[in-house]
Amino acid sequence: MKVSIIGATGYGGLELIRLLHQHSSVDIATLHSFSAQSETLANFYPHLKGLEASPLEKINPAEIIEKSDTVFIATPSGIAKDVALPYIDAGLNVIDLSGDFRLKDNQLYEKWYGKKAAPEDYLAKAEYGLAEFRDNELATFIANPGCYATATLLGLAPLVKKQLIDPTSIIVDAKSGISGAGKVPSKSTHFTETNENMTLYKMNSHQHIPEIMQQLTKWDKSIPAIQFSTSLIPITRGIFTTIYVKPKNPITQQELHQLYESTYEHASFVRIQAENTYPTVKQVTASNYCDIGLAYNEKTNVITIVSVIDNLVKGAAGQAIQNLNIMANFAESDGLGFIPVYP
């Protein structure tokens, strides 16, 4: 299969290149950038010297359609809604890593992203690509989930799908490494601001909230809202999500663990920790795994769920490739069979 990557110079695009180089059934046909053309990526990223020689090209839809079977779009939100349309219309596989096609309600997108939404008919066509819970495995136009949304939804799914929790009780405390803010530097991602520091940001206003709610209410329509906070922590990669919920009825630690084990029994990239152990960000670094730990406090009737992912892999490029593997009927782990980098 021939693939093109639009937005190849961003962190998501770079991860796509790294992972696709290990894929047995995929060749990278073309690489595209808005900011640089006619140069190789190694000119900007020396770690790719001798590994990726394809020149960066301007975006020419006719040429991309001619040379490619699949197009990955790894641009910031607000760009893909226009860039993706020719490839969708041409019948290519399209996987969008931005948030432009995740929300079915265009007014919600414009409220939370502050940008004009994609056309409604394209929003209707997009399949939300939470890989472990795809509705249509044959869909060829995928809205890849956000990193916070992925960690949160995988953490909550076993309980919410069976409607076992008090729908008003969901509290999510999510923390991200600095790469989650993207490649373009800002005051909040400056070394002197992030080193030895932790910063709460977008309190009650993060754009992944409606995406999470959209999926949760598909599983349990009675959920009215979630309390969701996000923080930047001084690491390069990783999402560390701590989720608190109250079960409708008391549950034992063993029952809780068995529920998660059975839900994810056939999920290649979700690993449930042994009872009374909890995951760390480092154990999933540079991998497509989501690791989950669980606890139940009988005194407070509160379940604590700890869900960790690498924001650039399971939270972006890795899940995008997992979605490609599902739609193309490749082995789900092709291009993703990495042991996490440790220490």
Curated annotation (Swiss-Prot):
For this protein, the record's InterPro entries field holds:
AGPR_AS, AGPR_type-1, NAD(P)-bd_dom_sf, NAGSA_dehydrogenase, Semialdehyde_DH_NAD-bd
Q: Which reaction does it catalyse?
A: N-acetyl-L-glutamate 5-semialdehyde + phosphate + NADP(+) = N-acetyl-L-glutamyl 5-phosphate + NADPH + H(+)
- Pfam families with a match to the protein in the record: Semialdhyde_dh, Semialdhyde_dhC_1
Q: Name where it's found.
A: Cytoplasm
Q: What residues sit in the active site? A: 147
Q: Where are the transmembrane segments?
A: none
Keyword Cell membrane listed? The answer is no
Q: Which domain of life is it from?
A: Bacteria
Question: EC number(s) per UniProt?
Answer: 1.2.1.38
Pathway assigned in UniProt:
Amino-acid biosynthesis; L-arginine biosynthesis; N(2)-acetyl-L-ornithine from L-glutamate: step 3/4
Q: Could you tell me the keywords of this UniProt record?
A: Amino-acid biosynthesis, Arginine biosynthesis, Cytoplasm, NADP, Oxidoreductase
Q: What GO terms fall under cellular component here?
A: cytoplasm
Sorted alphabetically, the Gene Ontology BP terms of this entry are: L-arginine biosynthetic process
Amino-acid biosynthesis in keyword set: yes
The molecular function terms of the Gene Ontology recorded here are:
N-acetyl-gamma-glutamyl-phosphate reductase activity; NAD binding; NADP+ binding
| Summary of the function given for this chain in its UniProt record | Catalyzes the NADPH-dependent reduction of N-acetyl-5-glutamyl phosphate to yield N-acetyl-L-glutamate 5-semialdehyde.
Q: Which family would the database say this protein is a member of?
A: Belongs to the NAGSA dehydrogenase family. Type 1 subfamily.
Q: Please give the name of this protein.
A: N-acetyl-gamma-glutamyl-phosphate reductase
Give the organism, scientific name: Listeria innocua serovar 6a (strain ATCC BAA-680 / CLIP 11262)
